[in-house]
Amino acid sequence: MAPHKHKRTLNIYFDTDYTIIGVDGSLRPGARKLFNNLIQSGDHIFIWSGNGIRWKDLDRHKLSHFVTECLEKPLANFQSATEGIPKNSKPDLVIDDNLEIVAALGGVWVNRYYFPNLEDNELDIVGEIIEEVKSKGISLNPRYRKTPIF
């Protein structure tokens, strides 16, 4: 039996610090390419941070035009904290260096990004996992956590 195609538009929530932006404010390699690919395939990018709304960082890196909305990220009680998000904007996948929020909401855990490193390919891996989830409904990559049903 052929695998069922799950291609659909996703709301993808990216953390900022240590996920797409380093300690020194540098942009993680592959961020612009990944954001462009996600937008081209119809997905919606949300940026959230436990350190407030981050439009200034997105503007500095010329990423604002990719982003649907910036939000304050909850730091605890992740499921109940996201209940106030409108249904059509709820996270389908969370991309974060904090495994706890990824496990609670579903998504992809990434290694922390601190300083410029041209060898860093974390966001290439994230892109591959997202494509796998979109086409198969799941990824077998150990960094992926299925969205819990609640």
Model-predicted regions and their roles:
Residues 2-80, 149:
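Alpha-helical substrate-recognition element adjacent to the catalytic core
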Residues 56-150:
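C-terminal cap/substrate-recognition subdomain and adjoining C-terminal extension
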